[in-house]
């Protein structure tokens, strides 16, 4: 039987499949027979009799009957100018994944990590495109890492490989990480189809409706400001949920050449941003130990449950105390001598010290609504020691010191007047701080309510 006769014979079996011609030509390459198209095949096929007939038959059966992915049969896949070896047990590289590389801002990056690297597609392509980068690839599957190392040699690039589970790999990188790029498992069970049956399930499916890995990465980013950029692949069917998860970060969507959504680029050089109405989300970040930068009725302030965190951010004397903000419903928790004054002076720009602790109920309806959710919390002006707070939130996003802090920004339509509150010490009966205008107002309120200073 010559090659032409084999083609006709197999076309009778599988010719109803619209991909038969292309698959046949591709599989011939595995056996050293290369034809540009069917015309070239027909021109020479009748004269070719020395070939592995049974091998070609078995390969066609593996594809059309057993539905084994073509790259597993051929043993390799070509993506642009790069060639990747493939084998069962390791996720097959996809050309669309390379669309993630077009958003890499490599000019300011030195070290990049490809998490869940599989056969090394993104790590190798990244190193090939940006040779100056120090690139790591990590995966939990030792078989995948062995194949990735082969692919790196095949494509003549140097990548360092780490066997570790997702974020655990980052602890094994000894230099500051600037870029994380990842195509982790993101499908749920309902999204699997028969064409994926032969690929490793743990490379495809994630718990938590497919976003488990992204939730872990979200939590990691909240406390790791040194990572400048994160690039993620995800399913188009998860776009809405995916964008919602990372909505507090500055992001841009990534699309393939076919204009299909494939992932997201996160600019982690900017602080996360929430609106003041997102009270539950704000409390969740505060509970994680983050500090809010938020406009108050006086100045742009810092809010945190931890005084030590405020000391660290402000770089100030740890022996000083901070004002505690509270909601109206919490006034009855105050010392008795302050409860009466609270009803007369609050909400307003008056801070009272009693028993060595400072309290204030701010004059901002939006802020009071937030305080009802977050509870009693420490607040201070958003500045370093011996410096003044900025007048605009945007200034914090553009300041190299502040964007490195474990902070997030809360947008509030209420504008601060850039004047600190008056402070009155009930323990010593003394005014600790206040402008001349504030003193006049304070004295007027004392007189109105027939109170003695």
UniProtKB/Swiss-Prot annotation:
Residues 276-437 form the YrdC-like domain. One of its GO terms (molecular function) is S-adenosylmethionine-dependent methyltransferase activity. InterPro entries: DHBP_synth_RibB-like_a/b_dom (IPR017945), DNA_methylase_N6_adenine_CS (IPR002052), N5-glutamine_MTase (IPR050320), SAM-dependent_MTases_sf (IPR029063), Small_mtfrase_dom (IPR007848), Sua5-like_dom (IPR006070). Disulfide bonds: none annotated. One of its GO terms (biological process) is methylation. This is Uncharacterized protein MG259 homolog. The lineage of its organism: Bacteria, Bacillati, Mycoplasmatota, Mycoplasmoidales, Mycoplasmoidaceae.
């Amino acid at each position: 039987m010559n090659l032409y006769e084999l083609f006709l014979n197999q076309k009778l079996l599988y010719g109803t499949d619209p991909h038969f011609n292309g698959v046949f030509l591709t599989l011939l390459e595995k056996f050293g027979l290369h034809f540009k198209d069917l015309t070239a095949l027909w021109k020479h096929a009748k004269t070719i009799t020395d070939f592995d007939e049974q091998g070609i038959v078995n390969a066609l059966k593996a594809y059309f009957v057993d539905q084994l992915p073509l790259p597993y049969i051929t043993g390799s896949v070509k993506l642009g100018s790069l060639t990747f070896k493939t084998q069962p047990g390791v996720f097959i590289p996809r050309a669309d994944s390379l669309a993630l590389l077009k958003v890499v801002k490599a000019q300011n990056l030195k070290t990049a990590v490809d998490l869940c690297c599989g056969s090394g597609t993104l790590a190798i392509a990244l190193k090939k495109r940006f040779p100056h980068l120090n690139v790591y690839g990590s995966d939990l599957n030792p078989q995948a890492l062995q194949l990735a190392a082969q692919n790196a040699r095949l494509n003549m690039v140097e990548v360092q490989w780490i066997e570790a589970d997702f974020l655990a790999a980052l602890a094994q990188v000894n230099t500051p990480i600037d870029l994380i790029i990842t195509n982790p498992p993101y499908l749920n069970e309902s999204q699997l189809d028969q064409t994926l049956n032969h690929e490793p399930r743990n490379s495809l499916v994630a718990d938590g409706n497919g976003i488990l890995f992204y939730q872990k990465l979200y939590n990691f980013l909240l406390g790791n400001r040194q990572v400048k950029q994160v690039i993620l692949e995800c399913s188009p069917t998860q776009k809405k949920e995916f964008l919602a998860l990372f909505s507090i970060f500055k992001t841009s969507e990534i699309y393939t050449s076919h204009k299909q959504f494939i992932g997201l680029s996160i600019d982690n050089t900017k602080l996360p941003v929430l609106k003041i109405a997102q009270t539950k989300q704000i409390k969740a970040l505060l509970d994680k130990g983050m500090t809010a930068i938020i406009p108050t009725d006086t100045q742009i302030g810092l809010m945190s449950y931890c005084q030590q965190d405020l000391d660290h951010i402000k770089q100030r004397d740890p022996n000083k105390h901070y004002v505690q903000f509270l909601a109206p419903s919490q006034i009855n928790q105050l010392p008795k001598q302050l409860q009466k004054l609270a009803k007369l002076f609050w909400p307003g720009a008056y801070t009272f010290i009693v028993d060595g602790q400072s309290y204030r109920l701010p004059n901002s309806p939006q802020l009071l609504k937030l305080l009802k959710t977050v509870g009693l919390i420490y607040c201070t002006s958003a500045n370093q020691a011996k410096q003044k707070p900025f007048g605009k939130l945007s200034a914090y996003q553009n300041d190299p010191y502040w964007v490195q802090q474990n902070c997030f920004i809360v947008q509030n339509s209420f504008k601060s007047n850039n004047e600190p509150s008056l402070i009155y010490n009930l323990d010593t009966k003394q005014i600790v701080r206040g402008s001349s205008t504030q003193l006049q107002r304070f004295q007027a309120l004392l007189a109105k309510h027939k109170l003695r200073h």
